[in-house]
């Protein structure tokens, strides 16, 4: 009989090791990147980065940020954990670790938004892990995956009629998309976001929040 491999968890200390594992999972995104939590640390927040090993092989990871709110201190894990969800032993160990880390920082609850498609199967799994549906979404209410390997024509063919109409309107108005890294660019972005928030009646992110996020990714040349 083959000897069972030892499962253990530890704090991550290497950006290179962390990002290599996160990038190896196609479902992952910037919400579990090293730099996203450098941004939170720059805000003065406590961050958690945990790696899970079977012997010397990394098999799972999650990053979270400790937030304070009127309803109490909590930890938010957006876009994670990154794990093989069919590995029940690993998933159980990971959520036990999440609970332990939350208690370490005096959190009264943990908010999790994994990279799973919304389905009866995924909801059943969350319930089995002791999770409850949150009254408010974390990061975004709806998320999708856009296959950039497809041609522009194929992408547009799969888009909604309303989306295609907006693209045609943007082209008619000579709207261009550019990538900027200057301080002036983020200031202008913050100004426009506040105008949009006022028009659409939602609460905008603060300029400090957006600027620190911008600076974290600019520093890493992302």
Model-found features: residue ranges?
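Acyl-donor binding region in acyl/amide transferases
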Residues: 70-137
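A conserved beta-strand-loop-helix scaffold within acyl/acetyltransferase catalytic domains
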Residues: 4-71, 114-141, 145-222
